Regions:
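Ferredoxin-type iron-sulfur electron-transfer modules and their immediate structural context
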Residues: 1-140, 191
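Beta1-alpha1 glycine-rich phosphate/pyrophosphate-binding loop at the start
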Residues: 23, 54-65, 73-75, 102, ...
Length: 203
């Protein structure tokens, strides 16, 4: 039986392979379909499936539990270069999908992410990825212009730079950040946090 906060769920007992003699009658021709019944269509955990950025939630939670905060930050930044910003304004879809909520309450995923992201604001524990430079051609000589210094444009420039390109971001406002700076009120998202993360992207 599986205990949940609403009681318990009883599953039918299954015979163990060691208890029966294996034969053709035990073989299912549609075993592939039957095997997938308990899996999500995406083949990933519910929290990662619910996350719009598809961050490996279970991965960085495990790393954080082991005290490997920089490695957890590295894992988050594979999909999201603004961990501190998202730690403050994320609507926590991962927590809504967390299966731990069927037992007692969902894991405080956003609080863990926010704590990990704070490490990025500290110069000593900051994670700045190394450039992946092709061995044959070296760095790319092509110039790339990114129009707009909002979260999408800055993310684009970040991942291009990581691949060995040298992008230039063009922004008409006095400072980059887009809606992070101009659309979200300061009581919801501190502007110094946005500026700090943009400075990290410049590195």
């Amino acid at each position: 039986n599986l205990c949940t906060k609403d009681g318990y769920i009883e599953y039918p007992r299954q015979e163990l392979p060691d208890d029966v003699k294996w034969g053709p009658e035990k073989w299912s021709v549609d075993y592939r379909d039957r095997n997938r019944i308990n899996c999500y269509d995406t083949g990933t955990s519910p929290c990662k499936t619910a996350c719009p950025a598809h961050i490996a939630v279970q991965g960085y939670l495990k790393l954080a539990a082991q005290g490997k905060y920089r490695e957890a930050l590295q894992l988050i930044k594979r999909e999201n270069p603004f961990p501190a910003v998202c730690g403050r304004i994320c609507n926590r879809r991962c927590e809504d999908a967390c299966t731990r909520g069927t037992v007692d309450q969902a894991v405080a995923i956003d609080e863990v992410k926010r704590f990990i992201a704070q490490q990025d604001l500290n110069a000593e524990t900051r994670f700045v990825p190394e450039k992946v430079i092709p061995k044959v051609d070296g760095e790319f000589s092509e110039k790339i212009a990114v129009i707009g210094g909002g979260p999408a444009g800055l993310s684009c420039a970040y991942y291009l730079a990581e691949k060995g390109y040298r992008p230039t971001v063009f922004e008409r406002e006095a400072r980059p950040g887009g809606m992070l700076m101009n659309g979200i009120p300061s009581f919801r998202l501190e502007k110094d946090v946005v500026e700090a993360e943009i400075d990290i992207l410049r590195e």
